[in-house]
Amino acid sequence: VYQLLGNAYDEIGQSGKAVSIYEQGLKKFENAGCLYLELGNMKYQNGDYKNALYYYEKGIEADPMFASNYYRAALIFFASTEEVWGVMYGELFMLLERDSERCKSMSRELYKIYSEEISFGRSGAEVDFDSPTIVYSNSSVRPNLFPESFRSAMRAAVRGERILDLASLNRIRQRFAKEFSANSSSFENVLSAYHQELIAQGHFEAYNYWLFGYGDPKQTASWVNANKTKWDSFLAWFEKNPISINPSNVFSRYTME
C-alpha cells in the first residue's frame, strides 16, 4: 500500500511526498525491501548514486530474498571501478529471479563484465575487478578486504588460460571456487556456499553455462546439445534447490567487513 501510494505521488511530480510515504511505510514495516527499493530509486533519479546504494543495500540486508535491490545495486557497481560487488549482487539477483527478462539481461551483463575485467597479454592474464579508490562509500578507507581477496583468488584461477569464452570461464570459476574456499575463509558467504553445493552435486559446469548463457547463446546451445543429460540433471536439481538467503547469511558489502 505504501509503495503504491508513494509511486502515485511520484508519478504526479510530488517526489517529496512520495519519499515521506515510503519513510512512513518503513516505520511500520522495517523489513520491506520494496520500500528501500523505492527510496533508492528516488536517489538514483537525482544522480545521488551513493545514497541510492545505501537504500538498495539496506534493502538487501532487511529483505534478502527480494531480488530487485540486488539488481539495482549491481547495475550501479557495473558502472563503477568496483565491479566485484556488481558481479556478486548480479549473480545473487539471477538466483532469486530466474528466467525473467531482467535475469537474461543480467546474464549478458555478467559475461560482459568478466570479459572486460579479465584480459590476456604477453605477460599473462590481468584481473581488475576493483580499484583502490572507493567510489561509493562514506568511509575514508576501503570498507573491507573482500575485493582484494576476490582478486587474489581470481588471479590464481586464470593462470594457464589464454582466452576468455564460456568454456574457459567455467574452468576459471571452478578454480576460483576452490582457491577462495581454501584461502578466504573469513569471507565465506551464501554465494560461495551455494557454489560448493553445486560442485558437490556435480552441477557447477552446467550452472556456469546457465549463469552466463545469454552472453554467448551460440556457445551455450552447442554445449547444451553436447551435454543434454548433464544439463537436464542440473535443471532438475536447480528447480528443487533454490538458494536460501536470510538475515543470518545475507551477503552485502557490510556483512563482509
Residue spans of the language-model regions?
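Helix-start (N-cap) detector for alpha-helical repeat units in TPR-like alpha-solenoids
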Residues: 32-34, 67-68, 101
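Canonical tetratricopeptide repeat
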Residues: 3-4, 38, 72, 109
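TPR/TPR-like (Sel1-like) alpha-helical repeat modules
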Residues: 81-102, 108-118, 125-129
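Canonical positions in the second alpha-helix
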Residues: 24-25, 58-59, 93
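Structural marker of alpha-solenoid helical repeat scaffolds
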Residues: 28-29, 62, 96
